[in-house]
């Protein structure tokens, strides 16, 4: 694997070039929980050294849900580009990234490989606008959430806020000539809008879908089960991995 240096964000929002692969040699979950490592370290661990519940080192690739040589990969919530780098090292022929938040997008531009395309948009059910916030500090790189999700989650210290353009999920599928094989989604609570709106034809065109789900409201589990049933009806197999108290979970879907 290419030992690529990555542009990351410090707690204060400064861009810092780091060797996340080398830092990972000393990484531990206990150390992360104690503050010895930050969200950038955890993201590298999650993409390259996870190995939990039969994944192949990446939480988004498990059982039959994995990137094949030549795949076109759609990365929704690309952040600074660690998963996109993973996809390229796995042999993807093209990686299409969407990331709405300016500080992380600026790092993504610098980190992207030759096979990666980047777009500064949020992704939703249809075109529009929303406000995205980063809370706590800039190493909280999973914290770029829409204003609506912030209201649903909790009152946190907002350190960055910006209005962003939303592009509809079906427009993405219709806007690229290349067939998308693998879709990864980590959009911090926006998955309900996207997965409710995506057409059966576009879902069915995928071989794999891997998504991080966030339980942001009481009836979320009902939505999740309906979506699982929908995917099963389209011929997908699936696996759900719950974390901690169960509010955060990873769902892997694949066709054999």
Residue ranges and their predicted role:
Residues 1-256:
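Phosphate/nucleotide-binding beta-alpha loop and adjacent structural elements of enzyme active sites
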